[in-house]
């Protein structure tokens, strides 16, 4: 599943082709995604793109009359193609702009979304989201207060979008390894120092992943077709039975909250 770095990479990749351009039309080939594609999108014509931004794992395209909001789901990706390029099987939506380019949405599993809102601050899916992990608001004091009396597993806690957005499975695993914290440790048992370390490493891991263009495991590609190279930096995620890069102990895995978790039993003692 594309996580925050992959969505940020996608935003950065398509921004030069969209910002300031005029959308001539939006072609919807398959409206049945996770939710039905908003009917307003097919009616957009001759609208200027004001800006692109991101909230959590949502891509936001600001137009003159409102906002297109995209989510890549489990297998979605956006790529920049030329008008007239062949359409692939899972190409479900095109944003056709006046510079000869098409921003094309591909999603084999159709678990993504394309929605519309006129008022971003009233968009229902954004109302209960926590702070952005790379923002100043997300600091050790905030995480310390949020974690008090929480009996949930630490990894589940970090992946809760009401706590902090965008820390998905890949990057939660990597962060906990770098902090020498077991994924099943209860969130409420964190010390103030551990909260500070977690915040620092979350910011560092996500920033590094963005610089590397995200992580390509199966479906994700950057808008220019290149893979995300952070996959080469993964220390524990997906590395069950491989040696820990720190101590050489075999990496183990377990399921927490229906997600695979990877950790070193020696470096990350519970």
Swiss-Prot record:
Cofactor(s) of this protein: Zn(2+)
Family of this protein: Belongs to the FPG family.
Active site: residue positions: 2 (schiff-base intermediate with dna), 3 (proton donor), 57 (proton donor), 259 (proton donor)
Superkingdom of this protein's organism: Bacteria
Covalent S-S links between cysteines: none
Reactions mediated catalytically: Hydrolysis of DNA containing ring-opened 7-methylguanine residues, releasing 2,6-diamino-4-hydroxy-5-(N-methyl)formamidopyrimidine; 2'-deoxyribonucleotide-(2'-deoxyribose 5'-phosphate)-2'-deoxyribonucleotide-DNA = a 3'-end 2'-deoxyribonucleotide-(2,3-dehydro-2,3-deoxyribose 5'-phosphate)-DNA + a 5'-end 5'-phospho-2'-deoxyribonucleoside-DNA + H(+)
UniProt-listed InterPro entries: DNA_glyclase/AP_lyase_DNA-bd, DNA_glyclase_Znf_dom_DNA_BS, Formamido-pyr_DNA_Glyclase, FPG_cat, MutM-like_N-ter, Ribosomal_uS13-like_H2TH, Znf_DNA_glyclase/AP_lyase, Znf_FPG/IleRS
FPG-type zinc finger locations on the chain: 235-269
Free-text remark on how the cofactor is bound: Binds 1 zinc ion per subunit.
Amino-acid positions noted as binding DNA in the UniProt annotation, renumbered to this chain: 90, 109, 150
Protein name per its UniProtKB record: Formamidopyrimidine-DNA glycosylase
Chain's role: Involved in base excision repair of DNA damaged by oxidation or by mutagenic agents. Acts as a DNA glycosylase that recognizes and removes damaged bases. Has a preference for oxidized purines, such as 7,8-dihydro-8-oxoguanine (8-oxoG). Has AP (apurinic/apyrimidinic) lyase activity and introduces nicks in the DNA strand. Cleaves the DNA backbone by beta-delta elimination to generate a single-strand break at the site of the removed base with both 3'- and 5'-phosphates.
GO biological process, one term: base-excision repair
GO molecular function: 8-oxo-7,8-dihydroguanine DNA N-glycosylase activity; class I DNA-(apurinic or apyrimidinic site) endonuclease activity; damaged DNA binding; zinc ion binding
SMART domains: Fapy_DNA_glyco, H2TH
Keywords: DNA damage, DNA repair, DNA-binding, Glycosidase, Hydrolase, Lyase, Metal-binding, Multifunctional enzyme, Zinc, Zinc-finger
EC number in record: 3.2.2.23, 4.2.99.18
Keyword Zinc-finger in record: yes
Pfam families per UniProt: Fapy_DNA_glyco, H2TH, zf-FPG_IleRS
Description of how the protein assembles with itself and partners: Monomer.
């Amino acid at each position: 599943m594309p996580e925050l770095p992959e969505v940020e990479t996608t935003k950065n990749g398509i921004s030069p082709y969209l910002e300031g351009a005029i959308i001539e039309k939006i072609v919807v080939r398959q409206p049945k995604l996770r939710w039905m594609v908003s009917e307003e999108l097919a009616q957009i014509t001759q609208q200027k793109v004001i800006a692109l931004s991101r909230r959590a794992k949502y891509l936001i395209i600001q137009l003159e009359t409102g906002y297109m909001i995209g989510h890549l789901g489990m297998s979605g990706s956006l790529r920049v193609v030329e008008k007239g390029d062949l359409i692939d099987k899972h190409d479900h939506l095109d944003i056709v702009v006046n510079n000869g380019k098409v921003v094309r949405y591909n999603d084999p599993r159709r678990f993504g979304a394309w929605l519309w809102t006129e008022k971003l601050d009233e968009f229902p899916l954004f109302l209960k989201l926590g702070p952005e992990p790379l923002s100043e608001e997300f600091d050790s004091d905030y995480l310390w207060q949020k974690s008090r009396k929480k009996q949930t597993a630490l990894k589940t806690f970090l992946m809760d979008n009401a706590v902090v957005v965008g820390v998905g499975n890949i990057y939660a695993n990597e962060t906990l390894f770098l902090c020498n914290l077991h994924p099943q440790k209860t969130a409420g048992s964190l010390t103030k120092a551990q909260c500070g370390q977690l915040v620092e490493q979350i910011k560092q891991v996500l920033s590094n992943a963005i610089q590397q263009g995200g992580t390509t495991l199966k479906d994700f590609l950057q808008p220019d077709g290149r893979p995300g190279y952070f996959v080469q930096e993964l220390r524990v995620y997906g590395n069950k039975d491989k040696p820990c890069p720190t101590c050489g102990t075999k990496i183990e895995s377990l399921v927490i909250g229906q997600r695979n978790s990877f950790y070193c039993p020696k470096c990350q003692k519970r």
